[in-house]
């Protein structure tokens, strides 16, 4: 894979070994604008790599250094995610630059092919677990939406990157106590059980038994990745079964 070197001044030393991969979209008008921003010392943002629509890859920060891409976030108990992760920015306007009809711009095949090839190389070098291949919205659900519900997570999983619940429909439905569904304002044991499952997957959520805005944000982030046609932030039975299946898959991997 040909990689163009575009050194960014925005990095420092890691405080932990690499065991995580974080995927982002750039969310800007053009890839050039995103690249220039990550090369600007005053912007204080960067990523290790950026992948253009045609599959071109630029490296901005060496993998042994701490790029500044994750910001404030949490996954599986870790909070200094810049220290333990490699970050890839994928050129795509996303929610910030939608198409004329309001839809999200697609990720071209050549770009996704490059994402898969580069990601495989990274996880091979660092022995990154499948459960630690995440999107920006996974680690910061209350403030980030990328790489978006239009990102082909299932395609990546089929290529060996990340987990996909193949038996979600068959997951136990014994949480019938969910009733008609859970949403903001609901409280009690069913909510706490839901929060515990989301926390075990990795979301930075403290089980409280209260379905608050933080819980809603985590459910929505989950749906952006594993139930992309259903972006409600509500937990109906389909969402619950998918959450249970993903949690089981993560537990089996561990």
Give, region by region, the residue ranges found by the protein language model.
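Short Gly/Pro-enriched loop/turn and capping motifs at secondary-structure junctions
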Residues: 94, 139-140
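Cell-envelope/ECM-targeting effectors and their regulatory/trafficking segments
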Residues: 59, 71-73, 77, 105-134, ...
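Active-site-adjacent loop/helix surface patches within enzyme catalytic domains
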Residues: 1-131
